[in-house]
Design a protein with these regions (language model features):
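Non-catalytic alpha/beta scaffold blocks inside enzyme catalytic domains
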Residues: 1-122
Length: 122
């Protein structure tokens, strides 16, 4: 894991456009569509040597990629996440701003699927 502070969203886009960032890793979300200037963000993503999207489902950001690209499917919060240390949970916020643990109830589509966190820590 990085030991120094990274970029915020705007700084990341500027660094990609300037060629200072060559790899983009998106953990969930729809980065290109969620930023204030989507056309500029799409150009920044195209400037990357590699874009990696770790996602539960396809979205528009997957259509804009760097020179090389990976789309890695990951478990959603409804999927059971079994790790060597035991079953895992994610936190969710309800409409009353209360945080709860959510454990999936569905068998994953494949034994090869991992959670987004498992991709980051393996």
């Amino acid at each position: 894991m990085p030991r120094q502070p990274g970029h915020n969203t705007v700084e990341c886009i500027q660094a990609m456009l300037a060629g200072e960032v060559q790899v983009f890793i998106g953990l969930g979300g729809n980065f290109a569509q969620a930023t204030p200037d989507s056309p500029r963000t799409r150009q920044a993503l195209r400037n990357c040597a590699l874009t990696v999207q770790i996602s539960t489902k396809l979205n528009r950001s997957h259509l804009t990629m760097g020179r090389d690209a990976l789309i890695l499917p990951c478990l959603g919060r409804t999927d059971i996440d079994r790790q060597a240390c035991g079953p895992q949970a994610v936190t969710v916020e309800d409409s009353f701003s209360m945080i709860h643990a959510s454990r999936g109830q569905l068998e994953p589509l494949s034994t090869q699927m991992r959670s987004g966190q498992a991709y980051m820590y393996s």
